[in-house]
């Protein structure tokens, strides 16, 4: 953003609309590819953000600080919420059957296994398993990002119930 010029946004700087700047920042960040991000922000180079991570988080970026926040969430460095123990147990008991399921089939399978589960229960607990957080990319995108091996690895981190 070295070429950024406020005078091109408003002729009257005291009347500068912060919302317009934030909108511009959001759209600019989301339009960048991984190489642009690494070149523009040296701190992100130090964090070794991957193209796969960038593609996962970029549509959730509002401001620059969100990049680091979302990266911490996706990398499970900001665990705040634990999933329901019964949900973990359900996944562990059916892990071999979940292995090859696409996201929508995963949801249907879990509802079939436990008809007390709502889609919301599945989405929130899956998010809590994968990120330990309420925020972040969509649960479907997280499921695709981590894949079965990531889900299984994280499940194995939870104590045996």
Predicted regions, residues:
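Conserved nucleotide- and phosphate/pyrophosphate-binding catalytic cores
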Residues: 1-161
């Amino acid at each position: 953003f070295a070429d950024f010029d406020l005078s091109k946004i408003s002729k009257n700087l005291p009347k500068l609309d912060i919302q317009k700047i934030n909108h511009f920042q959001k759209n600019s960040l989301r339009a960048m590819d991984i190489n642009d991000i690494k070149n523009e922000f040296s701190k992100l180079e130090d964090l070794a953000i991957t193209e796969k991570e960038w593609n996962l988080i970029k549509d959730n970026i509002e401001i620059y600080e969100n990049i680091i926040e979302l990266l911490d969430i996706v990398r499970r460095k900001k665990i705040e919420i634990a999933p329901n123990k019964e949900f973990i147990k359900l996944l562990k008991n059916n892990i071999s059957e979940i292995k090859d399921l696409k996201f929508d089939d995963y949801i249907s399978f879990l509802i079939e296994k436990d008809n007390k589960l709502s889609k919301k229960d599945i989405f929130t607990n899956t998010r809590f398993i994968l990120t330990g957080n309420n925020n972040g990319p969509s649960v479907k995108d997280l499921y695709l990002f981590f894949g079965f091996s990531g889900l299984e690895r994280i499940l194995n981190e939870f104590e045996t119930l």
